[in-house]
């Protein structure tokens, strides 16, 4: 298992193999990242290209934790106005969450450009690579990605029921599942 972590860390240029977390699928990885990251009163920017695996946890946190949401619209051809990200940033903005490519249109987002915007403003950048992991190049360091969520069963050629989350150094998430051994570890 650790060998697979090492391969994924190398493939995505994730700084450390022990920062690769295995999940049942991308939906679980996205829920773990989104729910583990956001706090009451945080503001998040996403696009209107997002999959329900991003939208539903965001809407839930909007209702339960008073997380506020803004969306960068795509035009009729599915293209993003990248300047809109900066125009939506507020003092309470915590993160930008962005799909790498739409599952409906196939349009790809320049995640390197969005990552640069996020980091220029001290924001966390979370990428949903469910459609692109194994298809388009993804480099967490070069594209300034803090959290990368992916599924294993599509272009990574893994079995159904596999996915993962890669975290940049210094990113911590609130646990969303608890239980187990009874020994504090």
Residue ranges, per PLM feature:
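Pyridoxal 5′-phosphate
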Residues: 1-185
